């Protein structure tokens, strides 16, 4: 395995771990049992990629290579055990830790999986289709989290929190442009970092899209 392939593998696993952890935390907050925590963690980690692969007419990568499901399940189990044996510690700080960990895990997963969605589209032969590549990147980035929130019966994170899906779209478009001009490695690294930066700035400066609050009724 060359250095570039190793970097991509580590990024892919990091995104899997981050999204699995976010799914497990949501499940714990919804008071699901161990099985529910693991299922939600796995679905969050591989859900977006499976949706992408179905659109591309391919067997989902998570089914062809079980390491992603295994890593997601192991991460979910570890998160469950940490919360289980440190219940008193986390209960006293649940809101602070929940928001912080969700922000970090979701942001990392979003950045990495967005560019890997673009990568999958390029590998499938759609380098010239900017719209499709951006769509695949965004779907891969937000799909797992959307599935997680629907299964947990909570308002989808991508619709109610600081700029989220828009960060994924921007990162996907940038990734496509970098792919064509500078190659795969710069596109994936810079593209993922751009998503993470936009998410950080959105939270730091409270960027939100307009919404109807109901006060004008």
Regions found by a protein language model. Name each.
Residues 1-46, 50-130, 157-163, 168-217:
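Alpha-helical transmembrane segments and their membrane-interface boundaries
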Residues 44-48, 140-144, 148:
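Glycine-centered tight-turn and secondary-structure capping sites
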Residues 150-157:
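Alpha-helical transmembrane segments
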């Amino acid at each position: 395995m060359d250095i570039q392939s190793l970097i991509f593998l580590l990024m892919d696993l990091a995104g899997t771990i981050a999204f699995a952890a976010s799914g497990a935390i949501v499940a714990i907050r919804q008071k699901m049992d161990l099985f529910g925590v693991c299922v939600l963690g796995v679905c969050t980690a591989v859900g977006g990629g499976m949706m992408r692969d179905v659109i591309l007419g391919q067997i989902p990568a998570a089914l062809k290579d079980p390491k992603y499901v295994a890593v997601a399940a192991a991460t979910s189990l570890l998160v469950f055990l940490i919360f289980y044996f440190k219940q008193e510690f986390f209960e006293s700080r649940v809101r602070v830790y929940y928001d912080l960990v969700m922000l970090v895990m979701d942001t990392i997963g979003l950045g990495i999986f967005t560019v890997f969605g673009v990568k999958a589209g390029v590998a499938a032969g759609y380098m010239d289709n900017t719209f499709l590549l951006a769509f695949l990147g965004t779907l891969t980035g937000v799909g797992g989290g959307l599935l997680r929130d629907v299964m947990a019966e909570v308002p989808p994170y991508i619709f109610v929190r600081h700029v989220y899906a828009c960060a994924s779209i921007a990162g996907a478009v940038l990734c496509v442009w970098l792919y064509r001009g500078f190659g795969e490695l710069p596109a994936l690294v810079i593209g993922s970092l751009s998503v993470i930066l936009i998410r950080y700035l959105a939270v730091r400066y409270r960027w939100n899209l307009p919404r109807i609050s109901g006060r004008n009724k």
